[in-house]
Amino acid sequence: MSICSDNWIIEKCLKEKMIEPFVDKQVRFENGEKIISYGVSSYGYDIRVSNQFQIFTNVYGSIVDPKQFDTKSLVKIEDDVCVIPPNSFALAITLEYFRIPENVLTICVGKSTYARCGIIVNVTPFEPGWEGYAVLEISNTTPLPAKIYAGEGIAQVLFFEGKEKCLYTYAARNGKYHRQMTLTLPLL
């Protein structure tokens, strides 16, 4: 596997709609104001977070159980800014919809702007053949409240192209998060 360049990303997005909406450059300003960048970079794509968030709460005394997830553990927020409480965690969804080619695997890493503020973004790999909006897991590791800006960059996706197609794509395995259109909570 080798990492894919901006040329490859642009070509796949223009010809195969791998990312929609797609921005073929780095955007660092909007309406004359600095923002957290998004769009194509040298060897990746900086994704944006939508305005749909769910923050974990302990109001109902729930236990987080991935096998029997209790939606009372979360508070829904739809806003241009999400404030994550100290040492807390939020889920969000990307603005971009992805269609991953059958010989490609992605890895997503956080942006340094947020990382230097103690905000860690975790996203599991986008597997070959997967498509959908990506769910983002965002941790505020600081003892202070932390802001997340909707519509701005949140993480970078790196694309790795295999020498051959895999035997079973995510779609062929009927992956449980295939074609997710909303902020999907844990499924078994």
Curated annotation (Swiss-Prot):
Does the record carry Aminoacyl-tRNA synthetase as a key word?
A: no
- Its Gene Ontology biological processes? dUMP biosynthetic process; dUTP biosynthetic process; nucleobase-containing small molecule interconversion
Q: What's one Pfam family here?
A: DCD
Q: Which reaction does it catalyse?
A: dCTP + H2O + H(+) = dUTP + NH4(+)
Q: Known EC number(s)?
A: 3.5.4.13
Task: Give the superkingdom in one word.
Answer: Bacteria
Which residues are annotated as active site?
Answer: 137 (proton donor/acceptor)
Question: Listed GO molecular functions?
Answer: dCTP deaminase activity; nucleotide binding
Q: What family does the entry list?
A: Belongs to the dCTP deaminase family.
State the name under which the record lists this protein.
Answer: dCTP deaminase
Organism ancestry = Bacteria, Pseudomonadati, Chlamydiota, Chlamydiia, Parachlamydiales
